[in-house]
Amino acid sequence: MSLQNSHSKKYVLTFFMSTCLLTSSFLSTSARAASFTQLANQIPTLSGLSEVQRKQKWNSYTLQEKQEAWRRAKLTPDFVQAMIDMQTGFTESDLSSRNNKTRHKAREKKSELDLYIAGTKQGFKEKVDGYISQGKIPTPEEAAQNLEIDYDAKKTDNKLEKNQNVRRVEKDKKALLDLYIHSITTSVKEKEYITTGQVPELGELEKALNISKEEAKHRRTIIRDQVMANERPKLVRSGTVLTKKELHKRFGKDTTTDDTKYIDDITTEVMYTKKQGYVNTDFLPKISEIMNEFKVDKGRANLYLNQIKAGIEAKLLADNNQTTTKPFTKHSRTTTNTAGISSGVPFDTGRTKPETKSFDFKRSMYSLLNRKQEDQLSKTEQHLKQQIKLEENKEEFKEILTKNPIDALLFAEQSNLGNSFKQEAISNIDLSKDISRILFTVDDKGNRTILNTILTTTPEHKDELIKQAQHHAIQTLPTSISDKDVSDKKKLTLATLAATEDKKVLEEALDNWLSTNGYKRKPEVESLISILLSDETTLKAGIDKIFELPVENNVNNNSNKGQNGTPILPPTPPLNGSMPPSPPPPLLNGTPTSTAFNNSNPNHKFDLKNFEATYPRLYKSYNEFIQNTTSASQSQATTTSNNIPDTKAKMGESLELLKQKVAKQNEVIGLIHNEVTKLYNFSPKTFVNLFNTENEEIIKKIEQIAKREDIQKILQDNDIKITSTFVSKIFNESLEQTKQRLRSSNIINAKQYKRIEQYANKQECVTEFLRITNPLEQLKFANKYINILGQSTFNGKLNELIENPNKLTFSQKINFVLQGYQELTREIPTAKANLNKLKQNILEKIEIQQLIANKDISRKDLLDILNNKNPELLKSLLEAKVILEENKLNNSANEVDLKEIIPSLNYLTSEQLTSLINRITIEGVKTALKAKWQQENKTVSNNTEKPLIYNNGTPMPPPIPNGNSNFGTNDYLISMGYTQEFIDRMDKVKPNNNFGKNHNYTATDFKSNVGKNYYESTSKLGGTDILLTDSQKLENAIKKEVLAKYIEEPNRDMQDDSLLKQAFEEKFYYAEDKNTKVIPKPSEVNFDPNFIGPRTEVGQEIYELYEQELLKLARDPVFIEYVKNNNNTQKDERELLISFIEQIESKRPELEQKYGSDVQSEDNNQEKKVGHLNMKQFQSLFQQENESANDESSTKDDPQPEDSNKKSEKSDSETALSPRLLSSNDSKNDKSSDDKKSLLVLRSSEEESKKDIALESEDEAIDMSFKTEAIAEQDEATQRQQVSDDTNRKVAILVKATSTLHKPVHYNILSDRLKVAAIGAGDEEASINRGVWISGLYGINKQGTWKNIPKYQGRTTGVTIGADAEFINSHDVIGIAYSRLEFQIKYNKKLEKTAVNGHLLSIYGLKELIKGFSLQAITSYGHNYIKNKSKSINNIIGKYQNNNLSFQTLLNYKYRTKYDLHFIPNIGFKYDYSRASNYKEYNVDIENLMNQKKSNQSFESSIGGKIVFKPIATVNNIILTPSLYGNIERHFNNKNTKVNAKATFKGQTLQETIIIPKQPKLGYNIGSNILMSKKNINVLLEYNYYTHRKYQSHQGLIKLKVNL
C-alpha cells in the first residue's frame, strides 16, 4: 500500500510539473499574467467602480468582449482568472483520473481555458480573422506555431513513448490544437453558408463541423437568421410575400426563430410600398385580392383598404382644392370598385357639372363670429367658432397630407388635432426618405419636434426609426464627415448612429478624412475618435438620448452627453510632447461646457495605447494629422484672432494640470474616508464595508465633516466642491483599496488590521464559494478553506445535500458515488458518517431507468452503483443472466419472464430489463458481489470476534490471512445463499477467458454456415481477405450465404446477377428507412444488422433471406462466443462486432416468430449442396470495388447451371432444402416422383415449445384441407411436419382473409346518402322518397409475408341489392340490403386455391341531428362457409361454417366552406362477433380431423373525413358530384389467436396448435367516388384502397339506384 501511495504521489507531482510547464509555454509572451484588479484599473468603465460592481459589470461581458479588454490592456489572465471569466470549473487532479471519461472531460475544459488565454494575446485575433477571411483551415503545424507551443505527435503513441506523463501532456496539447482548428473551421463554414445564402440541414451541419446535435441546432439558427436578414431587402424589392410553408422550403424550419414576425415585417414593407401605387391610380382592390396578394387575414385587408381609400380621398381633395373665396362645398368624383365599395368622396354624378356659386353657411358664420371680440362671445358662440375652426383645420390637414405628410404632422400638432390625424400622417411618412428631416429638424429650444411627436403618438415606431436612422447614418457619414457645412452636432449624431451598427464605417470614414488635405478640426476629429473607442453601453446611452428615451443607469450617462444627446468622450493627449489645442478641465459641479466637442469626462480617459492597439492604421493617420495641426497652430497663433486659444494648444500642460487636480481630489477623498472611519467603533465588518455602497447615514456624516473649517479650507484651496459626482467617487473604494488605506493609516493597530485582513479574506472566499455552481465543488471548496469559512459552512452545505440530494444532477450523483465519496472521506474522515448518509440518499434517488438510459456509464461503474444501491438486486440480475445465457447455449427460444425472476423491477418494461441484463456480465457481477462481501466481512471482523455464520447456519471459515489460504473461490457465493448447483450452472455458461490459448476452434464447431465461413476467413494468414477488417469479412460471409440461398432455387435465372450486384455492392439501406436514400456500406460506418438491398422484388426476397441468416447466427452459440472473446480482433472492430451480436440477439424473438418454422439448422458435418455454381461467377459478386469492371465478363463466360441443378435434385436425399425450394419442386410437376423425394426438416425444439406458451386470446376453429399425393412417399415424421406447416400457413391465410371480407360492403352502403344541400320548397312533392338499388363489387388483395402469415393474393367479387326509404323533410334514411360475396384465395401452388363464400344481410339507417350533425348505423348478419375439393386422386373434403354479427355506427358533421365545398369529418365505432361451428375432414391418410366450436369478438374505432365538391351540371341535365374520403382505424381488444386441432393420422393421434398473430393496431382507408344523377336515377362509381402492415386491398364499385 505504501509503495502504491509513493508511486501515486510521484505521478501527481510529475504531472503537476508537466502541466505547469505547458501552461507557462502559453504565458511566455510579451504580455504578463495579471489579476483582474490590474485589468480593471486600466478599463475606464471599471476603474471607478467598487469591487462588487466591477465583478457584476465584468460578468455581463461576453467572452469576446472580455478577450478584447485583455488585449487592449496588453495583459494576460492567469489560469484561475480564466476559469472565472469563462465561469467554468476545472479540477487539476481530474487530468490524472483513472476514469477515461473524467480525464477526457478535464482535458476538454483545460483546452478551452488555454485557448481563451491564448485569445487574449496580441495578434491572435488578427491571425484567426485572416484564416476566416481567406476561407483557409490551418494545419496542425501552423496551429502549434500560432499558439506558440511545441507539439510532437509521436509522443502521443504509447508504442513510441513509454512515459505516460509525457503522453498525457502531449495529448493535452493536441486537444488544444484540435479545438483551435475546430473553431476556425466552424467560422469558415458558417461564413461560406452565409455568403452563398444556403441554410444547411441539421445532419449536414453535424457532419460538416463534427459537432453535437444541440450545438448544430444553435449554429444553424445563427446561419439561418443571418441568411434571412440578407435576403429580406431582396424580398421587399421584388414584392414577394412568403407563406410559412414557402419560408420553410426556402430557409428550412427552426423552432427558435419567430418566423411569423419575419413574414409580418416583410408583408408590412411590401404593403406600404404598393399602397402609393393604388393611391396614384385611384384603384381600390377587392378585399379578396388584398388577402390573396399579401396573404393577410380579412381584418388586416380591411384596414389596408381603408388606408388606400383615405389616400385616394386626400388626393381627390387636393385636386379639388379651392381658395377661401370659393364656396365651401367642393365637387369631386367617387370611384367604386368591382365589389361595390364606394371611395367615400361625395357628389359623384358620373358626369362633369358646371361650377356654381352657392351660399357657404360655415364660412359666413365664422366670418360673423370673427368680427366680435372674444370677450363678447357667448359660450355657445365660442364653441361654435371652435368647431368651425376645427373643421377647417381638418380640411387643411387633408390638403397638406397629400403634399407632405411631415408638414401635415406638424400642422396636426400645432392645431391640436386628435391622435388619429397624427397617426394618419405618420403612416404616410416614408421613413427611408424623410429620416434626415425627422432627426435634424429642431425648434427654437433645440428640441426635435418631429421625432418627439412620432414617438409620442406611435411609440411602436421606435425600433423602425432607430433602424432607419442607423441605415441613413451609414450611408451619409462618409460624405458628411468631411463637409464643413455640416454642423458638429449632426456629425456626432451620425457617428453615434453608425457606430452602434458598424464601427468599421466610422473607422473608414475617419481614415479617409484624415488622409486627405480637406477641412478638418482637431476637437472634431478627437470627439469622433472617442465615439469610435466607446463601448456598447455608452453608445446605447447616446442612442437613447438622441431619441429622448429613458436612459439606463449607466456609468456617467449624464455627464457624457452633448447638447444633442450624443455621447462625448475626451480628446486624445498629444503624441509628440507638443501643445495642440486642448479642452478645459472638467467642472466638478457637473455643469457641461457650451461646445459640443469640448466636454470632458474624467472617468472615460482617451487611452492612446488602446487606440493604437485597436485601430493601428487610423492611429497612424491621426498621428500625422496631430503633427500637421500642431505646426499650423504654432505658425498661425499670432496672425489671426480666430486661432485656437493657447490653453488648448498646450495639451500637455493641460493634461498635467488635470492629473494634479485628480491627484488632489484623491487625497481629499482619502482624507474624508479616514475622518468618517474615525467616527465608528472598530469592527472589521463595519470598516471593510463602509464605502462599498452609498447610504444616507454616511452621506450625512460626509456633509458634517465637509462643514468643518479645516476641511473647508482644504476644499477651497484645491477648488473642490461636494457634488453628487464627487460623492459617488467616495463610495467607489474597492476591497484592496480599503485594506491599503487602513494599513497605511494610524486609525488601527497591527492586531486590528490582521482581523480586518481575515475578514476581507473571508469575504473573498464567500464570494468565490457562491460563484461555484456545482454543489459538490462547493463542498470541496468549503473543506479546503474551512479555516476561513468555518466548520458551519461545510456542515450546512453537507446537511443541505443530505436533505435534498436532487440538487445534484444525475452525472454529479454518479460521480459522487463512484469517486467523490472516496475522496471526501479520505480528506475529511470526521465527516464520514454524514457522507455515508449523503451517499445512501443519493443512491435512493438514482433511478434504475436512468442507469439503463445512460449509455455512457461503463459496465464496471454500473455494477458498482447497483452493488452499492441494492446487492440483492444484483443477485437477481445474476440469476436472470445465467438463465438467458443457458438459453443461448442450448439454442432455446423459450421466452423468459424476467419480471418473475426480478419482481423488484416489475415496474420496468421488458425492453428495459433486457437492456440492463445485456449490459452486465457474469464475471463482473461475481467480482462486484465478492468485493461487497469482503467489505462486509472486514467490517464484521473488525467489530466483533464472534465466528461468522453462513445464511444456512453453518459456521463461516476465518478470514484469509494475506490472501494465502485454502478458502474456496466460490464460498462467498454460498454464504450469500447460492447453491452449488447454481454455481456449476454459472461455470458452464461462463465465457472462455483463455480464448485463442487453451481453446482451439474448428469449422465444424459452428452451427451456421456464416459462422463457419467467418471463422475460416479470420483464421487465414494470407490471401486477399487479409486486407479486409473483421466486420467486412463477416459482411461478405453473410452476403455469400444469402446469395447461395437465392441461387439454389432451381427456377432462378442467373440473369439476376446485375440486380444482386446492385443489392449487395452498390446500395445499402436501413430497414427503418424504406425510401431510396443512399447511405454508406455498413463496413464503412457501423455493422448494423438491419441493412438490406433495394426495396425491389429481388431486394425484398434478399432481405427475407438475410433475416433468416441472422436467425441462424443468433442460434449459433459457438459463433457468438467466438466473436465476443476473440482477443485477436482490434478493439474498435471488436466493439463493432459485439454491438452487431447484441442487436441480432435482441431481434431473435421477432425473427423466431417470423421465420422459426422455415429456418432449419444447418449440418456442418456435410457439404451443403447449392448446385454446381461456377465459382468465378460466385466470387465476382464480392470482389472489391476496384475489380468491379471484370465482373460482367467473368459472369458472361460461365454456362448456366441448369444441368448441375438437375444433378443436385437427384443427389443425397438427406440434404436439407428450404421450404421455398420444396414448394417450387412440388409445383413444378405434381406427378414427378423425383420431386416427391424432397424432404422437409422437422421444426426445431424452439418452435415446438412456442406452442405451449399461454396466449391471451380465445381459440378459433378453422377448416383445413390437405393435399396428400405430394407426401405419399415420405416417412411419417416428415409427413407430420408437412401437415403442421401446411396447417399453419393455410389457417393464417383464411383467418386474415375472412376478417376483411365484409369491410368494403359496410363502407359503401351509405357512402352516397349524406345530403350536402337542402331541397328547395318547390321540390317537396312527397314526404317519403323510396328507391331500390343494386351494386357490383370487384377487388384484388395482396398480403406480404408478415410474422407467420405467408404471402397470398386474393380476388373479391360480390353483388348487393337493397331498398330504402328517405324522409324528405328530415333527410332520414332507413333501408335493408343483401350481399352475396366470394373471395378467391391463391397462395402457393402446393396448397391450391380456396374459395370463401359469404351471405350478408344488413339493416342500415341515417338520422339527421341538429346543427349539421348526422348519425348513421349498420347492423349486419353474415354467414360464411368454405368447401374445398382438390383435383388430385385422393380427395380431401373440408367443410367450415362461420356466423358473424356486426354493428357499426358513424357520427358525421357537415361543414360548408366557400365555393360550395363541403367538409364532413366523422368518428365511428364498430363491434364484431363471430362464432365458428364444429367440422371434420376425411381422406385417405388423415382419417379424422376435428376442431371445436369457438367464438371471437373484436372492437374497432375510426376517425376520418369526406370532402364533397360542388356539383357540376353537364349536358342532358346530368349532375356530377365528385368526392374524396379517408379514415384511420384503430383495433382494440387485439389479441393473438390459437387454433387447436386434433387429428387421427395413420392410426396416431396428432395435436396441432396454430398461432394466429393479432391484427396490426392501425389500418388506413382512402377512396374517391363520383355520383351521376339525372331525374330519379343515380349512378355511383367508386374506388377504395385499404392497407395495413404488409396488406393492400383495391376495390372498385358501381352502384345503380332508381327512386320510385
UniProtKB/Swiss-Prot annotation:
Annotated Gene Ontology cellular component terms: cell outer membrane
Biased amino acid composition, Basic and acidic residues: 1193-1213, 1227-1240
Keyword Cell inner membrane: no
Biased composition (Low complexity): 554-564
Residues annotated as signal peptide: 1-33
Stretches with biased composition (Pro residues): 568-587
Cell location: Cell outer membrane
Keyword Membrane: yes
Keyword terms, alphabetized: Cell outer membrane, Membrane, Signal, Transmembrane, Transmembrane beta strand
Chief localization: membrane
InterPro entries on file: Autotransporte_beta (IPR005546), Autotransporte_beta_dom_sf (IPR036709), OM_autotransptr_brl_dom (IPR006315), Sca2 (IPR054014)
Ranges in coiled-coil conformation: none
Tree of life domain: Bacteria
Pfam families: Autotransporter, Sca2
Disordered, as annotated region: 324-354, 554-603, 1183-1240
Stretches assigned to the Autotransporter domain: 1325-1604
UniProt protein name: Putative surface cell antigen sca2
Species annotation: Rickettsia felis (strain ATCC VR-1525 / URRWXCal2)
